[in-house]
Structures are given as structure tokens and as C-alpha cells.
Amino acid sequence: MVISLSPNGSGRLNHQTTNLSNSLLTTLPYLPNSPLFGTDGIRGKAGELLTAPFALQLGFWAGQVLKSKTTTPGPVMIGQDSRNSSDMLAMAMAAGLTSAGLEVWQLGLCPTPCVAYLTRHSEAIAGIMISASHNPPEDNGIKFFNTDGTKLSSSLGQEIEDGLRGNLLLSVDEIAAWGKILYEPTLVNTYCQFLQDSLPPSLSCQGMKIVLDLAWGASVNVAPAMFKALGAEVICLHETANGDRINVNCGSTHLHVLQAAIQEHQADMGFAFDGDADRVMAVDSTGKVVDGDYILYLWGKSLLERGNLPNNLLIGTVMANLGFERAWQGLGGQLVRTSVGDRYVQSQMWETGAMLGGEQSGHIICHHYGVSGDGVQTALHLAALVHESGVSLAELVKNSFDTYPQILRNVRLEDREKLRYWQECQPLQQAIAQAEVGMGETGRVLVRASGTEPLIRVMVESECPDAANYWVNYLVGIVETHLAV
């Protein structure tokens, strides 16, 4: 017998289904017309799109697609951040996967790169992280990793979505099997050992005072332990897992708290992670923000000087500061830009053979050590650079480059259709062209839709701060007038 979901994607099964199938495939919530998978998996508000029934069926259909790609199915790793909804979604995903006949290894609270690493270095056929990264507590997300630890391809994501929307057929026999769930939180120790092994054997943080903003999130157990093991004096902020407060006025997108703590404790440096610890932002002893552009420059320069950076190539995004790009070119390096999103950086790194890439927002990928952005690893290696240089992080940054004034503004769009087709707004396209002509080669304009939130992001960069302010205000006004109403 064959069963199928109804053509309208409601999730209701046809009348030929058995009691077994109905117990496994319950009614889906409303699915938006727009694609479910964004630049970083599926994101949304918990309790709206991201419900237990949705995660159950997502797990089931993901399991079916994953099983179809291998003759010897292994387990699926599931990790999660500290959000209140993460337990629910992780358990529902596990139920769906096991109802598809797969074994699930539950890792519990851990950073996203931990899931990627353990998936790559085990018999797992996939990894799943329950997290909405830097988003507020009421949001959540589900991101998938291939068996090699890289982000799930768009084609596989589409196959899974086709199942959810009723475009795949299954026999009853295919849904009559079930797997088991194993709880494996101690595997996180294997990831910590990998972090340790990636560092120079001679590295010591003795004498360093380091502040860590853990954002009430996934790094609370890993980051402090790693820095303390290296001998650093560690001051922790937001240091427990707290699902009500994750990312709230803290972490990598709210650096004022870290800056104040560094001044208060007269620390050498500090690091702020986001909720799932796949990104990091640093702050030096003077309170200056050391973002992904600075980290790429400093780490890239170190690799270049050692002959470990093929073609002197770095991969950045369209957000990378012009000051960074021109300083890097001054060292004989080249910078290739991609769209915003670490999956695009990763793809370009594979295509070009680049060993280091990342985003201004703090997603840094180094292929010498792994295949995913890793906030804790990046922080450890930046501390290693400081140790090896014999000078402070503040001194390294001071001698690197001066940034061009860059202003980023966000405009929220609740209308999904307007957000999806924003590029068809002719007044906005005309305004962008006007700004580009107005600044010429002295600046840049970037308007884009966020891949993770219902936002239009407007960025203007210019040698002249007044010009940057003028054009960003002008463009935001156009977006608010023609799209946000």
C-alpha cells in the first residue's frame, strides 16, 4: 500500500492510510509558501512554525531522505542550545528520525561546531543542531549537517521539504520500522580534545586575564574550561544555560557589556559568543571591537608569514570592510567576496582551495582544523596569536588597518511576500543606483534580505562619515515607505 500527504500540503493523509501511519504522521501546522530552508536551516518562532508536530514530521522525512542516500545508515547526531523550546524540538526530531528507522545520538547542550565535528569524525550520516544562533529566546531553528560536517546542500533540503509538503510517496512498510535513542553528552569531551589538539603545544595563557561573555548559551561548559586549562584567569559573564535570557542584551551582538567588564577588571581581552557558539567577537584591552574582519586579517597574516595560506587568499563576504580589503591587498593578499552566510563562504573556500574565510559578524572557518565556523576555536587561536606575538591584542589591532565608516540599519518586514520579492521594488533599485553614483569609488552600498530574520538590511560604507549617514538614512526611508507599510 502507498500513502501520501494531501496535495495542498496540509499534512492530512488520504483515506487509505493505516492506524500506524496516522500515529506517525500527524497534521502539519500551516506551512508558508516561501521556502522553509534559509541560509542556515529552518528558523522561526517556537510555537508557530516550529512546533513538536512539525519537528516530528521534519525528522521523519529527513530520515527517509537520509536513508535513501546510503546503504548502511548510521546514527544522526542531535545537539541543542539552551532555549526553552530546544528540548521539545530535539525530542520531536529524535522521535521523527527513529520512526524512520534511524538511530539518534542526543548530545544535549553543546556548540553547533561540536555537532559538525562529531558528525564528521564518526559513523553518523548526519548532524542536527537545534538553535537560532544569535536570535532572541522566542525564536528557534533546525540546521542540518552532512556526514562530512558541512552544511546540508540546498538539493537535500528541498527533498526533505518536498516530503513535508506532500510531494513524496512512501509505502507502509517504510514507516513500520523504528530506531533507538542514545544519550551521549560525554562525546562533547571529544570535541574539547580536538580544540586542544588544534593549538600550538607551547601555548600558554598564563598571566592573561580574559573575559568571556557566554550569552547564557551553548558555550557555557566548553569555553571557560578551555581557557582555564591554558592557564588564563577567566572572568565569565552570563555563564549558565538560561533559555529565558539567551542572547538578551549580551553575547556577540551586544558588546557593551563585555567592553564594560574588560575596563572594570582591567583585562587583556575578551570574547563574546552567540547562542550556539559558531561565531565570536573579540574586544581588546582598550574596549575596541575586534570583529571578523580584524580576526581574518590577523590570522591570515600569521598563516601567510608561515607559508600556510595558498595564493595568499582569504574568503570574505560583501560585508567585509574596504579598509580591511585594501590593507590585505597591501600585504600581497587577495580577498574574494561572497554573499552573506557562512555556507557561501564555505562553498567558495572549497571551490578556490582557500584555507581561511569568514564573515565580519564573527563566523570564521579555517580548513587547517575543520569545516565549520567555530567561535571557541577562533577565540583560542586569536589568544595564541597574541601569545606568539609578544604584544597585546590592542597593539596587534592598532598596527593592522583602519576601517572605513560603515553603517548598517535593519528594517523589519512582516509581509513575507514583500520580503521575498523586495528586489522588484523599483523605487528602491533607483535609490540604490543613485547612492552608488553619488559615492563613486569612495564607498559602497549593500541592500539585502536577511537569511535568518524578516529584515531588510541596509549597509552604506564610505570614506566620508557624513556621506555614509546621508545615504543610509535615504535608503532606509525608501524601504520604509515602499516595503514596510
UniProtKB/Swiss-Prot annotation:
Residues the entry annotates as binding Mg(2+): S133, D274, D276, D278
Cofactor, how bound (note): Binds 1 Mg(2+) ion per subunit.
Entry-annotated residues carrying Phosphoserine: S133
Record PROSITE patterns: PGM_PMM
Any Pfam family matching the protein: PGM_PMM_II
Cofactor(s) named in the record: Mg(2+)
PTM field: Activated by phosphorylation.
Enzyme class: isomerase
GO CC, any one term: cytosol
Reactions the enzyme catalyzes: alpha-D-glucosamine 1-phosphate = D-glucosamine 6-phosphate
E.C. numbers: 5.4.2.10
GO MF: magnesium ion binding; phosphoglucosamine mutase activity; phosphomannomutase activity
Key word Transmembrane present: no
Keywords in alphabetical order: Isomerase, Magnesium, Metal-binding, Phosphoprotein
Active-site residues per Swiss-Prot or TrEMBL entry: S133 (phosphoserine intermediate)
GO biological process entries: carbohydrate metabolic process; peptidoglycan biosynthetic process; UDP-N-acetylglucosamine biosynthetic process
Role description: Catalyzes the conversion of glucosamine-6-phosphate to glucosamine-1-phosphate.
Stored NCBIfam families: glmM
Family (UniProt): Belongs to the phosphohexose mutase family.
HAMAP family: GlmM_B (MF_01554_B)
Full protein name: Phosphoglucosamine mutase
Originating species: Crocosphaera subtropica (strain ATCC 51142 / BH68)
Gene: glmM
